[in-house]
From Swiss-Prot:
Pfam families: Ribosomal_L35p. One of its GO terms (biological process) is mitochondrial translation. One of its GO terms (cellular component) is mitochondrion. It is found in: Mitochondrion. Belongs to the bacterial ribosomal protein bL35 family. It comes from the Eukaryota. It comes from Drosophila melanogaster (Fruit fly). This is Large ribosomal subunit protein bL35m.
């Protein structure tokens, strides 16, 4: 709710500010509404926008990065411009698979490159999948919406044996006596 309020407030302030009119098409083109990009030009007090030096500084985002303030890196969490809700990063769905118990698996990088140079043991290991660690799983869960975090049951799923985790007591599948 706070995110929706902030984005709507930023949108209304940006509509009123004449200096921020050149920034709005940039945000709409990239479809990223990060708070860092929108808050700098729009939330400055209006008297400071009167000087031409500030107006020129606001139009050049590269100047802000050169002055020592942190530049906008690729923020993996994206937000919609209309409601401010999180969006799913499509590269996560393409490269990773989420298991029902919360872990993410992926294939080895470079598993199909220059196989003639690699030993037979390495080629065998490259065919196997790798689990992500807890930090990576937490980040990947943030990058997808709740729809993709829910368990999905597909017909003839090759990952079906890996969706249940039976080595711990808390996650063992329970058998019922009839």
């Amino acid at each position: 709710m706070l995110r929706t309020f902030v984005t709507s407030a930023l949108r209304s302030v940006c509509r009123q500010s004449p200096a921020a009119s050149s920034l709005v098409p940039l945000v709409q083109r990239t479809q990223r509404a990060t708070l860092m990009t929108l808050s700098r030009p729009c939330l400055l007090p209006t008297p400071s926008l009167a000087s031409p030096a500030h107006h020129q500084l606001l139009q050049l985002p590269g100047v802000l990065a050169a002055t020592g303030t942190p530049s906008n890196t690729r923020n993996v969490t994206k937000f919609s411009l209309v409601k401010g809700k999180r969006k799913t990063v499509k590269a996560v769905l393409k490269r990773f698979k989420r298991l029902d118990w919360g872990a993410w698996i992926r294939t080895h990088s470079g598993r199909q490159k220059k196989l003639f140079k690699k030993s037979a043991a390495l080629r065998r290991r490259l065919k196997q999948h790798v689990f992500t660690n807890a930090t990576q799983s937490w980040l990947l869960d943030k990058m997808v919406t709740s729809y993709w975090r829910r368990p999905k049951h597909f017909i003839n799923d090759p990952y079906k044996p890996y969706h249940s985790r039976n080595e711990y007591y808390a996650t063992q599948s329970k058998t019922f006596k009839v």
